[in-house]
């Protein structure tokens, strides 16, 4: 049961991070362009 809960939390956090990256693509593009 606890393993299932941990898996759910990890997948939810991964989805949240992915949606945040998708919501702000320009910031990451600028960082990639000027970071080199």
Swiss-Prot record:
Q: Name which cysteines form disulfide bonds.
A: none
UniProt source species: Doratifera vulnerans (Mottled cup moth)
Residues carrying Tyrosine amide: 34
Lineage, please? Eukaryota, Metazoa, Ecdysozoa, Arthropoda, Hexapoda
What is the name listed in the Swiss-Prot or TrEMBL entry for this protein?
U-limacoditoxin(1)-Dv5
Per the UniProt entry, the signal peptide is 1-25
Swiss-Prot/TrEMBL keywords: Amidation, Pyrrolidone carboxylic acid, Secreted, Signal, Toxin
Tell me yes or no: is Signal among this UniProt entry's keywords.
Answer: yes
Q: Where is it localised?
A: Secreted
């Amino acid at each position: 049961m606890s393993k299932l809960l941990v898996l759910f939390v990890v997948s939810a956090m991964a989805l949240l991070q992915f949606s945040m990256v998708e919501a702000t693509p320009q910031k990451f593009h600028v960082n990639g362009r000027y970071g080199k």
